[in-house]
Structure formats: structure tokens, C-alpha cells
């Protein structure tokens, strides 16, 4: 099913954008892993899907559980192996995280998890504070986390934009990093502070990759929606 969808979507994406993939040697050619990218446009999942397609990996995504209840669309999500996520108090949790993680590992799949959980609230599109879904999945399944950053999707579709900019073709750069070292968190019981510390390592890696792509330095303090009276899910501003 995924290959059928890709056959329809990939040509369209190639028409509107040029994809420049960097450090692809960091993406495992086989075996399961979590791909953890930054997130600032609704079109990001398509961009990362095309990137994985180019690398001959068929990605899965963690999707809001409510989407699986939509007629036809929900069936499509299930048919393509997407993983439902329950959202509660601003925290993303797989409906059965251990079972989902084990299935991903058993299948040898690549799963895309946005650690921020939603579009960044940072006004300059830097990664904001992350949630623990990516590291929980990776640690429970004992698989690596591959950080990634992209820049250029905001030219295709601005944050909360309503129309895709079709012309001229946009350049999108995607940079993949080496696996995040989570060895300090493996093989032992973990509490909330451990997951938070592991998540910070992932967010540091993503931010560093984005700094490289942008040729800029990110703010010293990562954006935290709770300190700016912003919601952590859904829209936080009008387009």
C-alpha cells in the first residue's frame, strides 16, 4: 500500500521541490530505527517520506489515534502500518508503546517520530522542547535514534499555511546525523527524569544539524511553550 501511495505522491513532490540529502550514510540500510526530525510545516511528513523513499526505506509514522477513526482515511493508515498515538496533557504516548515498539523492531521498520510532537512554537522555527515519544520507542525496542533536520519546507508551505507554493521549485535540504548515544539509558529501569534527559540529547542533536543547514546559531535556551503561555498541541496562533 505504501508503495502505491509513493508512486502517486513522489512525482508530485519532485515537481515542486528539489531534494538534497546529506550524510545519508547515517541512515541504516536495514533494520529498525527511529528517525527524529524537526517539525515546522504540515508538509514535513511528506518531505521526510520522500527522503526515506529515496533511501529505499519505507517509513512508518506515529499518528494521532483520532485519525484512525476517520472513515477510509483510518483504514488507509492501518493498511500502511502507521502507529496510533494517544495525546494526554501535552504528552504523546503510543496507545500501547511497548507492543508498538516491539512490532517496529520485529518488522525491521523505520518509524518517523517528531520529538516536538507538533509544529514548533519558536518564532524563528528552531526546534522547541521535545517530548519523550521518540526515546521511549527507541529504548523499549532497543533500536537507534537517527536525528535529522530539514530546511526549506517552509517555502513550500509556511507554518499553518493553507496553500502549497507550487512554483518555482523549492530547494529542500535534509541532513541526517549519526545515532544519538543513549547507552546511558539502556538496560535499566527509567523514570521521567531519565526520559527527559534522553530527549534533551536528541533535541540537541537535531538542533545542531539545523544550525549546520541554516549556517546560524540557535538560541541558547530552547523554546518552551509552557513559559510563553502557549498550548503544546494544536494551533497556537492564527495564520
Q: Where are each of the predicted segments found?
A:
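Catalytic-site beta-strand/loop segments enriched in glycine and acidic/polar residues
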Residues: 103-134
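A cross-family acyltransferase "interaction/gating" segment
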Residues: 123-192, 223-225, 236-237
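Hydrophobic/aromatic ligand-binding patch that stacks against planar heteroaromatic rings
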Residues: 51, 76, 103, 134-140
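Catalytic core of membrane glycerolipid acyltransferases/transacylases, capturing the structured
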Residues: 28-92
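A charged, well-structured terminal subsegment
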Residues: 98-103, 170-212
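A transmembrane-helix-recognition feature enriched in membrane-embedded lipid enzymes
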Residues: 1-29, 71-80
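Short gly/ser/thr-rich secondary-structure transition/capping motifs
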Residues: 14-21, 92-95, 156-158
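Short, highly charged C-terminal tails/helix-capping segments
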Residues: 214-238
Amino acid at each position: 500500500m505504501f508503495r502505491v501511495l509513493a508512486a502517486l505522491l513522489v512525482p508530485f513532490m519532485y515537481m515542486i521541490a528539489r531534494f538534497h540529502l546529506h550524510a545519508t550514510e547515517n541512515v541504516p540500510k536495514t533494520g529498525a530505527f527511529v528517525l527524529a526530525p524537526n517539525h515546522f510545516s504540515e508538509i514535513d511528513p511528506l518531505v521526510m517520506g520522500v527522503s526515506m523513499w529515496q533511501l529505499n526505506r519505507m517509513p512508518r509514522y506515529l499518528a494521532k489515534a483520532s485519525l484512525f477513526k476517520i472513515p477510509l482515511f483510518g483504514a488507509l493508515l492501518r493498511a500502511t502500518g502507521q502507529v496510533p498515538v494517544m495525546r494526554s496533557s501535552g504528552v504523546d504516548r503510543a496507545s500501547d508503546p511497548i507492543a508498538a515498539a516491539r512490532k517496529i523492531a520485529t518488522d525491521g521498520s523505520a518509524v518517523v517520530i517528531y520529538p516536538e510532537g507538533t509544529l514548533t512554537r519558536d518564532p524563528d522555527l528552531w526546534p522547541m522542547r521535545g517530548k519523550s515519544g521518540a526515546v521511549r520507542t527507541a529504548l523499549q525496542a532497543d533500536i537507534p535514534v537517527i536525528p535529522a533536520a530539514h530546511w526549506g519546507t517552509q517555502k513550500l508551505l509556511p507554518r499553518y499555511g493553507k496553500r502549497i507554493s507550487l512554483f518555482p521549485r523549492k530547494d529542500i535540504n535534509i541532513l541526517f546525523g549519526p545515532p544519538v548515544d543513549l547507552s546511558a539509558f539502556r538496560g535499566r529501569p527509567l523514570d521521567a527524569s531519565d526520559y527527559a534527559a534522553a530527549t534533551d540529547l536528541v533535541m540537541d542533536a537535531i538542533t545542531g544539524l539545523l544550525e549546520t543547514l541554516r549556517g546560524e546559531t540557535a538560541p541558547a535556551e530552547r523554546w518552551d511553550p509552557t513559559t510563553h503561555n502557549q498550548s503544546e498541541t494544536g494551533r497556537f496562533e492564527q495564520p
